[in-house]
């Protein structure tokens, strides 16, 4: 199967692709190249960097913001800004607190502590942005340029963590609501029933959104993970561990892209020695990931940045784009 044939599209529904791997293997290069190829093929495409390092703007040589920025025809890009995400998430918490005048942020924090194992607010803020894009059908395809493997696996585990946490929060909120009704006559600051109901509805809507994201993420017809590796042992072993973790989260990993493969060079003894070692590692990769489609991208003579260079990489990986 050709690597480009791994991408599946359902009319009216967004396809989601995660591109991940060890730090330094070229995830951003592959993400940007893939996004450009999809856009040239006529797909309305969004590429999102979830990596705080934010090298997507450097790769595309464009200024990219926290909200979708148009890069070329059909192509939009986002670099999630952790500080802005945190501000937006804290604003949501403030709004929840305002639902009940008797419950300030301190009491809201008490609720979070009571729920036990509440996720870190920075991670929850990042996940809040992630949810926003996982539950959209505005684009034909959304490509996630992910952080190094460990951070990505944590993010992908968040639907399960947040679903459990929000479920506990709903339970506690209902208990508080019952107490408020019981003591309302003597404790008027507990807030009215309409405010309580609205706060509960917000939590239930969040839980519904999380469940929708979980359903999409575990659907191989809509979501897939492409692993980027380089032909070195450390990268191979980390990718193998990541593949096993992805199975745990029911995320379909179907492709492996081997980046930075050395070309043949008969006049360079050092290059030939490195190439020989790489060929051994390539054989290892094909054996370990025999159930995946494996593609190779050669090491370039210059830096892999700029739209023209990225389009050439995409053509090596996927062939000429075929506009719809």
Curated annotation (Swiss-Prot):
Its EC number is 7.3.2.7. Anion-transporting ATPase. Catalyzes the extrusion of arsenite. It catalyses: arsenite(in) + ATP + H2O = arsenite(out) + ADP + phosphate + H(+). ATP binds at residues 21-28. CDD domains: ArsA (cd02035). Gene3D superfamilies: P-loop containing nucleotide triphosphate hydrolases. The keyword Cytoplasm does not apply. Keywords: Arsenical resistance, ATP-binding, Nucleotide-binding, Translocase. It comes from Methanothermobacter thermautotrophicus (strain ATCC 29096 / DSM 1053 / JCM 10044 / NBRC 100330 / Delta H). It is an enzyme of class 7 (translocase). Pfam families: ArsA_ATPase. This is Putative arsenical pump-driving ATPase. NCBIfam families: GET3_arsA_TRC40.
